[in-house]
């Protein structure tokens, strides 16, 4: 895919030189037509990154490139043209309370100079797309949180942007409404071809919607990859913590103590991979090694059409036989010994 948004050595600082940079030498490429999630804890630099994409902030050094244009080299009038191609939705919806749903969606079209008949036609199209035709003349206070966010999405799409920025757009919604909004964003991406950048601190959002993800910490990208890559084999402590909030495939310290108290055999955790080699080794465990096994913890998940996870096994047999089986297991996948 062609790059749609690029950060090239971007640093952004606020205040004096003693203040840590909000972004610190950041390099990142977001491809055209993908859903890209950026996840990180508070203060990681996520919101600053978004404001650089739509040129509401300017980098202290480095360059931000959108559609092949270096934003740092553009004049304000040219930046206005770039911003016109970028829609944005927010955590708190940011709707005009005094305007109807129709009026909120029509507002950016009016600012852009669309004639009244074209505005009416476009708003009708967007209301149908987000499933709110019957709410056209309602006011924001008459809407649920999910409906407000649908209005926000429709408004952000009004001028046919090529990029949609979603800054914590579901963090104030309940799980069911969040799922509905994420499904709508998937439609926006699939049917309209819009590149979507999602800023979030919720790994469930990443799992549900993203093609790729970057983990941001202290203004730097510390890990990036497809959602499957990051979920199935996180490389950094921060990524592992985030993944652990939605997946409990491996036992924690309390789980290990409980397993040790209930099981006398050796306990190992085996990473599940898509190639099926672990299953082949385990199927030979009794016949080849005279070792019995029991699954005592773990789980398997599916992402992007592939399976991954971890199984924690109790291995029961003579020590030499168990050693031989563990050696075979290590040849098939990653093995961590939990308890001898």
Swiss-Prot record:
GO molecular function, one term: ATP hydrolysis activity
Keywords tagged on the record: Amino-acid transport, ATP-binding, Cell membrane, Membrane, Nucleotide-binding, Translocase, Transport
Annotated localization: Cell membrane
Chief location: membrane
Binding positions for ATP per the UniProt entry: 40-47
Enzyme Commission (EC) number: 7.4.2.11
Name the UniProt record assigns to this protein: Methionine import ATP-binding protein MetN
Topology versus the membrane: Peripheral membrane protein
SMART domains attached to this UniProt entry: AAA, NIL
Function according to Swiss-Prot or TrEMBL: Part of the ABC transporter complex MetNIQ involved in methionine import. Responsible for energy coupling to the transport system.
Domain ABC transporter: 5-243
GO cellular component, one term: plasma membrane
Residues of the signal peptide: none
Sequence similarity: Belongs to the ABC transporter superfamily. Methionine importer (TC 3.A.1.24) family.
Complex and partners: The complex is composed of two ATP-binding proteins (MetN), two transmembrane proteins (MetI) and a solute-binding protein (MetQ).
Superkingdom of this protein's organism: Bacteria
Catalytic activity: L-methionine(out) + ATP + H2O = L-methionine(in) + ADP + phosphate + H(+); D-methionine(out) + ATP + H2O = D-methionine(in) + ADP + phosphate + H(+)
Alphabetical list of PANTHER family matching this protein: AMINO ACID IMPORT ATP-BINDING PROTEIN, METHIONINE IMPORT ATP-BINDING PROTEIN METN
